[in-house]
UniProtKB/Swiss-Prot annotation:
Positions annotated to bind (2R,3E)-phycoerythrobilin 1: D52, S53
Chain sites annotated for binding (2R,3E)-phycoerythrobilin 3: R64
GO biological process: photosynthesis
Places the protein is found: Plastid, Chloroplast thylakoid membrane
Name listed for the protein in its UniProt record: Phycoerythrin alpha-1 subunit
Function (record text): Light-harvesting photosynthetic tetrapyrrole chromophore-protein from the phycobiliprotein complex.
Similarity remark: Belongs to the phycoerythrin family.
UniProt lineage: Eukaryota, Cryptophyceae, Cryptomonadales, Hemiselmidaceae, Hemiselmis
Keywords in alphabetical order: Bile pigment, Chloroplast, Chromophore, Electron transport, Membrane, Photosynthesis, Plastid, Thylakoid, Transport
Amino acid sequence: MYTKIALLGLVGSAAAFNAPMMTVRRDAIATGAAAAVVAPMLRPAGAAMKKDSKAPCVEVFDERDGCKAAGTQKASGDDGFCVKVSMKAIGFNAAEAASVTKNYGIKRFGAKSV
């Protein structure tokens, strides 16, 4: 319902827009260029990237312990699995990163083998 209302409002506003005849194409392009220059400066502070280095971690728990039940199971949706998704801080270990770079010959982003 809300989608239809939003779409109707969008179509109505587009139909109601009528550029004045005295507007010159050059003025319209200059206004658009000025808006493109100013737009990045008007971003809200909340849009900045967080620097806490958290990433989603997915854990899957199996209550069956890897055992299958005797006979055939019907697809009831109760398969004995549980999924946990949480945000965890991801640490940086410089020694491990250097080891991976050295052992796998990775040369990206200026990383050099030690």
